[in-house]
Amino acid sequence: MQTSPLLESLMEALRCLPGVGPRSAQRMAFQLLQRNRSGGMRLAQALTQAMSEIGHCSDCRTFTEQDVCAICSNPRRQQNGLVCVVESPADIHAIEQTGQFAGRYFVLMGHLSPLDGIGPDDIGLGRLEERLQVESFNEVILATNPTVEGDATANYIAELCAQHGVMASRIAHGVPVGGELEMVDGTTLSHSLAGRQPFRF
């Protein structure tokens, strides 16, 4: 079946999004063209503007239109000496939604993966070490993902912190709230048992 080259191009472009296959891309393209052309134009404008204007914060490497993001430039965030290391800007968003952290961040944009050729310099650890040398941190909280690569990355950064006399901690991993023990995998359950907390009255 022959279709418009522009339509094919649109569907192919939509497939760059995570979880979008050929059928999903086709549905999206037809939806925009049939029922929501104004929404499609807004999407195109927002994408164009975001791709051309959003860069990385010079301090923490998250996404921002400014040289330094709003979190890093907030004096109250600078005072407590806490830095949370995460793998992606999406992790910042998740932590901010909890309302439990009032420090600053450092975004790795990935994790160490020697098999994929990703070393310390590829995830900005040189920049993090510079900050450890010149800034006064009370604690570095390692919030990398609970994967083999995430744990290896956290261990590497913890060693860097130790070399500079900065305390490093790892976020707790364990049974999710509302979860049932029989459904939890063995590794997660092991972490939960090792990180158990006493009752305080």
From Swiss-Prot:
Gene Ontology MF annotations: DNA binding; zinc ion binding
UniProt KW DNA damage keyword: yes
A GO biological-process term: DNA repair
Protein origin, superkingdom: Bacteria
SMART domains: TOPRIM (SM00493)
Keywords assigned: DNA damage, DNA recombination, DNA repair, Metal-binding, Zinc, Zinc-finger
Domain Toprim: 81-176
Zn finger (C4-type) location: 57-72
Annotated signal sequence range: none
Pfam families: RecR_C, RecR_HhH, RecR_ZnF, Toprim_4
Keyword Repeat: no
Family label: Belongs to the RecR family.
Physiological role: May play a role in DNA repair. It seems to be involved in an RecBC-independent recombinational process of DNA repair. It may act with RecF and RecO.
PANTHER family linked: RECOMBINATION PROTEIN RECR
Protein's recorded name: Recombination protein RecR
Organism: Pectobacterium atrosepticum (strain SCRI 1043 / ATCC BAA-672)
Gene name linked to the record: recR
